[in-house]
Amino acid sequence: MMREAASLLVGLALAAGVAGCRVHVDKGVNGEEKSVQVDMPFGGVHVKTDQTTAADLGLPVYPGAQLITDNDHHKSADVHLGFGEWELRVKAVSYSTADSRDQVVAFYKKALSRYGDVITCQGNAPVGMPTQTSEGLTCEEGKNARVQVGSADYSTGKGNLELKAGSKRHQHIVGFENPKNGKTRFAMVALDLPAGLQGSSGKSD
């Protein structure tokens, strides 16, 4: 994803004849791209991997949970696109624990409550009450969204359990993946959408 994003923006800059385009790529010890930064006079995109923690998302780490570091995941991702007043920001990090999913769900329901009402979603449908937050966020919001950086997919899969809090524009999500090796796996996502983006409008932002 990072290489494609950088290539696209550089191509746009050259096609438009924009002066002052700057591209910076940091690589890891094995040559993998750890971050890509493309800056232009009218905006840019910054992508970082393996540098974000739960605290950066405004959430605590479940006690004893470990960052997922298998081949299917970066440990975390931080994606920022900004073009004038149009800005999109996604932060994501994945963890696993030997504790049960129910224990993790209970922990994050309490942790997410700092952002207001917490809704429980299964397959984009609400489970129990409330069915939407006081700021208008529902289980339908973001039903087609995926957070993927390279081979690392932070989506929790169709039909899996998610906890959500916030508004349509500013969301905090804890989603649960299928268990692996007897461990509960979950991803935390902080999502900030630009004003006017389809699905992000509403009385509250």
Predicted regions and their residues:
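Sec-dependent bacterial lipoprotein signal peptides
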Residues: 1-19
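An acidic-aromatic pocket/loop used at catalytic or ligand-binding sites
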Residues: 21-205
